[in-house]
Structures are given as structure tokens and as C-alpha cells.
Design a protein with these regions (language model features):
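Phosphate/diphosphate ligand-binding glycine-rich loop within oxidoreductases
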Residues: 2-103, 196-198, 204, 208-211, ...
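Glycine-rich adenosine-cofactor-binding loop
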Residues: 7, 90-93, 100, 109-129, ...
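NAD(P)-binding Rossmann-fold cofactor-contacting core
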Residues: 131-147, 285-290
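Rossmann-like adenosine-cofactor binding region
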Residues: 146-212, 331-337
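Adenosine-phosphate binding glycine-rich loop
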Residues: 192-252, 393
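NTP-dependent small-molecule kinase module
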Residues: 241-249, 270, 274, 346, ...
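ATP-dependent small-molecule kinase phosphotransfer cores
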Residues: 284-339
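A glycine- and Lys/Arg-enriched "phosphate-lid" helix/loop adjacent to the NTP-binding pocket
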Residues: 344-382
């Protein structure tokens, strides 16, 4: 291996895509078991590598040189082999600092809560100190001096939170350590996790109306700084934004919500051609599981059982990337569905006026005009609440598709 990333589990990593977007080398992902780290590091069979969980501190004894920022932090994420001598750096510092600065949240003299005690927590504390925070509280499940327990965190006046733990990371997307709504003076938060793009922690912050971001921007920024070191070249910071926007657009799911007969399925098929993303219809996936029509299933088993299966389908689809997901009309009735869809998705409400919607027997909950109107009135505010983009579909469907493409660009 010449260039690459080492870690224990790398199935979720975007690093190969990012490095190969920017640099002219092949970037490999190499999973290394803890028992094999010693032989790998002693062999020095690489040119330049990045290091991730759980080896950011474990590699320190193998290094011949450690940069000043890495010494201050106490861990590295970047190693360069120069004629058999190993040089260690910490580019996570620059990535996290740029992400927080991008939020325009003034942390000077503020109280910050850091979740976790691993290598990234050391980076976070170094960044926060340099941003002039007043006090850093560090939460852990361990009982040690200088740490506070998760049961005690709500007793402190916290203004900002940084999650450095893997809690909420794919495939355990639903996991969450804390309830941000319990902090009354919270200005913002950062979760270093980038898969999913928005963890439930981030979504909770967004719902509260505070600045809240996942770790994708940090990941790209630290990669740019690593590439500068790898190749001894200058790369403008504008490149970070360029790659971020491109990768976000590539990885993000497009999720269509709206009433039955609003045009979601037709629009999804056309978007598939334009966006080069695979289409999944949640109703079709449900019927694949129940082995009958949704109409028959609801008549025999009731709506609640149908909604439970639908939620399971939504959870599984939401964990994937680069999809177009056409949802059933009632998907917005459960907040958990919408939080799952928002983790990796951009929600587009296909807003078709009630008078243009068509009741059909294949949709048991909206099979006549009376029920259709009733459901429309029950759901319209929820569609608008969860939508990132609202697009009218009241004339030519081609115009609707063009409007979606325009809004995505």
C-alpha cells in the first residue's frame, strides 16, 4: 500500500472517494486487527497513510517525529514515511476547527461539553481551547477524575456540544447518547460522525433551531490538509467547499413525500434518469415483504401493522446513500420515519392541489373523495413541516421535474 487509511472497521468510510477526487493516487482502505497493528507499523510498507479509530493514539510509539499540533493533542491521524522515518501529524485539528468556524458560533468564554474520551476528543479539546472557550466538560461512561457522567451532564450550563464518540454511526444509526432539548442555553453542536450525514443528535439540534452539523465537512477538510502534506503542495480552502458540495450531492438521498396520486412515482422514475441514482418505492418494498397488496393487508391486519412494516422498510432504506426514495402518503405520520429519512436524505414535498388528486381503490385509506380530503387536511401541515424543498405539481409534470433539478443545483 502506498496511500490509504488504516483502522479496525472501515466499511463506512468515504475517505477513498474524497482522496481520489482531489489527488492523483490510488487510496486504499486497509482494515487492521489490533493484534496486527504492531507488525504493520514496524514493516513501514507504505508512503502516506491516514489513521482512524481505534489507532490514533496507538501508533504514537512507532513515530520518529511528531508535529507540534499532534504533540499538543496527543494523537495523530496522518503518517508520512520519509526514507524509513515515520512523521506524524494531526489534520483532524484543522478539519474540526474549520467546521466550527463555518457555523459562525462564537465560542469565546462559552461552556462546551465533549462527548467521549478517545483520540478525537483530544483533538476537540485542543480546538476548543484555541477558540477561547471558558470551560470544557468531558462526558464518559467511565468513572475517572476530570470526567462527568452522562446522568450528570444536564446539571451544567452547556452552550455547545461536540460528539466524538461513534454512537449513532452506521449501521447503528438510531443510537443517541443525550437529549439536547434538556440544555436551555445551547447555541450549537457538532457531531464528528459523517455516516449518516446527519445523526439523530444533529437532527435534534436542527429541530431546536440551533447550528448543528455532522462531520462530512470536517472529514473533507482534514483530507485536504493531509493531501497537502502527502504531496507537498498547496490546495486552496475553496477546494474543501467544492468537494463537500459535490460529495453531498452524490451521497444524499432524494426523498419524495406527498399525497397518493401526487405524482411521486412518475417523478422518481424521471429523476433516476437525470440524477443517476437508483429508485426505491417504499410501498413496493412493503408489498415485497407482505406478499400481497397493501390494500389487502390493511383490510386483514389493520393500519397499525402496515405502518410498523413501513417504518422498518424506511429505516433500512434510509441507511443507504445515493437513492431516490418514493414514499407512501402516510410516511409523515411517524416522526421516527422522517428522522430516519432526513439522516441521509433531502426531503422534497410534491405539492399537488386537493382538486387534482385522484381517489383509487388500490389506496384503501384514500379510496373515495371524502377520505382523500380528510387525509389531505390531516397531513398537509406535516408535509410542509418536514420538507426541505416544496415543489408544486399542478400542471405539466415535466415542469415539476425541471423545477426539482433547478432547486437541487
Amino acid at each position: 500500500m502506498e496511500y490509504g487509511l488504516i483502522g479496525e472497521k472501515l466499511g463506512h468510510s468515504f475517505s477513498k472517494i474524497i482522496h481520489e477526487m482531489i489527488a492523483d493516487y490510488i487510496y486504499e482502505l486497509k482494515e487492521i486487527a489490533k493484534d496486527d497493528l504492531d507488525s504493520f507499523m514496524k514493516s513501514k510498507d507504505f508512503k502516506c497513510i491516514n489513521v482512524t479509530i481505534p489507532y490514533k493514539k496507538a501508533v504514537l510509539p512507532y513515530l520518529d517525529f511528531i508535529s507540534e499540533e499532534a504533540k499538543k493533542i496527543g494523537c495523530v491521524n496522518t503518517i508520512i514515511n520519509k526514507d524509513g522515518k515515520l512523521y506524524g501529524y494531526n489534520t483532524d485539528y484543522y478539519g474540526l476547527k474549520l467546521l466550527i468556524e463555518k457555523q459562525n458560533v462564537n465560542l469565546e468564554n462559552k461552556n462546551v461539553l465533549v462527548l467521549g474520551t478517545g483520540g478525537t476528543s483530544l483533538t476537540a479539546k485542543a480546538v476548543l481551547k484555541d477558540l477561547g472557550v471558558s470551560k470544557i466538560y468531558q462526558a464518559s461512561r467511565k468513572s475517572e477524575d476530570g470526567l462527568i457522567s452522562y446522568s450528570d451532564i444536564y446539571n451544567y450550563d452547556i452552550n455547545y456540544i461536540v460528539n466524538t464518540t461513534p454512537v449513532g454511526m452506521y449501521p447503528n444509526n438510531l443510537d443517541k447518547l443525550i437529549e439536547v432539548s434538556k440544555f436551555k442555553n445551547l447555541l450549537g453542536l457538532t457531531d464528528v460522525i459523517y455516516n449518516p450525514l446527519n445523526t439523530n443528535l444533529v437532527l435534534d439540534g436542527i429541530e431546536l433551531g440551533i447550528k448543528a452539523d455532522g462531520g462530512l465537512y470536517m472529514l473533507i477538510a482534514q483530507a485536504v490538509y493531509a493531501i497537502k502534506l502527502f504531496k507537498n503542495i498547496e490546495i486552496p480552502n475553496l477546494k474543501i467547499d467544492e468537494v463537500y458540495n459535490k460529495l453531498l450531492k452524490e451521497k444524499q438521498n432524494i426523498v419524495l413525500i406527498g399525497m397518493p396520486s401526487c405524482g411521486k412515482s412518475t417523478i422518481a422514475k424521471e429523476l433516476e434518469k437525470r440524477l443517476n441514482k437508483a429508485v426505491y418505492d417504499s410501498d413496493t418494498e412493503v408489498e415485497r415483504i407482505i406478499n400481497t397488496t397493501i390494500s389487502n393487508f390493511i383490510k386483514s391486519n389493520g393500519e397499525t401493522n402496515f405502518r410498523n412494516i413501513e417504518s422498518s422498510v424506511i429505516e433500512n432504506l434510509s441507511k443507504q446513500n445515493s437513492l431516490i426514495i418514493s414514499t407512501g402518503g402516510g410516511v409523515i405520520l411517524r416522526k421516527e420515519n422522517m428522522f430516519n429519512l432526513k439522516q441521509n436524505g433531502l426531503i422534497i414535498f410534491i405539492d399537488r392541489p386537493l382538486e387534482l388528486l385522484t381517489p383509487t381503490s388500490s389506496r384503501p385509506l384514500t379510496s373515495n373523495k371524502f377520505d382523500l380530503k380528510k387525509k389531505y387536511n390531516e397531513r398537509i401541515d406535516l408535509y410542509k413541516k418536514y420538507a426541505d424543498i416544496i415543489v408544486k405539481n399542478d400542471s405539466n409534470v415535466d415542469d415539476t421535474i425541471e423545477e426539482i433539478i433547478r432547486r437541487l443545483d
